[in-house]
């Protein structure tokens, strides 16, 4: 909602350039920014090739005059863009919305920001951060009574078994979500019930 309300002001403050999004997700957050900037190039970085393809397909429909470049990589580690004709001589505007940086350790956050600064070559970074949340609210969200979070996490074991020929028995694990006061975050884990 904030991006939609203030996209024009953000575009005026950043100036023109190619948008580089760190972790594309469903690509909905970048839509208003691309519209306001009128960017001719959008570079999406994501570890999931299928997420890149799906997100860029939708964006290309909504922004037919913007060249879409997907880069499958660990966007937390990348400090330079690969060679690509559309990416040459473009001023770069970084985009890392949401609150993902809050999930990093302080050291990893600093390393990510250093890499982003190098990758953006002096261009601005639009960074989304979350305000501190109450412990009870976070625990209710990540250890919900309906068990959606646990089911999602336990599904990872099924995917591991299917996609990587693993042999983990989901019945031998339990989901745990714990509030870490010092880091102001939830840490989720699958804990073995076996010795």
Q: Where would I find each of the regions flagged by the language model?
A:
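Conserved alpha-helix/loop element of class I SAM-dependent methyltransferases that forms part
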Residues: 2-17
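Conserved class I S-adenosyl-L-methionine
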Residues: 15-25
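Conserved SAM-binding loop of SAM-dependent methyltransferases across substrates and taxa
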Residues: 26-38
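Conserved SAM-binding motif I beta-strand of class I
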Residues: 41-46
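Conserved SAM/SAH-binding beta-strand->alpha-helix loop
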Residues: 48-50
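A short, conserved alpha-helix within the catalytic core of class I
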Residues: 103-115
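Conserved beta-strand signature within the Rossmann-like core of class I S-adenosyl-L-methionine
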Residues: 118-132
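Substrate-binding/catalytic lobe of Class I Rossmann-like enzymes that use SAM or dcSAM, i.e.
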Residues: 131, 137-195
């Amino acid at each position: 909602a904030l991006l939609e309300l203030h996209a024009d002001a953000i575009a005026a403050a950043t100036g023109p350039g190619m948008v580089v999004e760190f972790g594309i997700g469903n690509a909905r957050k970048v839509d208003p920014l691309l519209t306001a900037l009128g960017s001719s190039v959008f570079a999406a970085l994501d570890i999931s090739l299928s997420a890149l393809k799906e997100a860029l397909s939708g964006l290309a429909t909504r922004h037919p005059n913007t060249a879409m470049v997907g880069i499958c990589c660990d966007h937390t580690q990348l400090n330079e863009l690969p060679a690509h004709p559309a990416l040459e001589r473009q001023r770069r505007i970084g985009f890392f919305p949401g609150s993902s940086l809050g999930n990093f350790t302080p050291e990893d956050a600093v390393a990510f920001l250093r890499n982003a600064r190098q990758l953006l070559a002096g261009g601005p970074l639009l960074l989304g951060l979350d305000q501190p949340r109450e412990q009870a609210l976070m625990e209710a969200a990540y250890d919900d009574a309906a068990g959606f979070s646990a089911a999602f996490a336990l599904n990872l074991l099924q995917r591991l078994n299917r996609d990587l020929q693993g042999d983990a028995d989901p019945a031998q694990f339990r989901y745990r979500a714990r509030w870490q006061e010092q880091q102001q975050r939830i840490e989720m884990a699958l804990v073995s019930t076996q010795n």
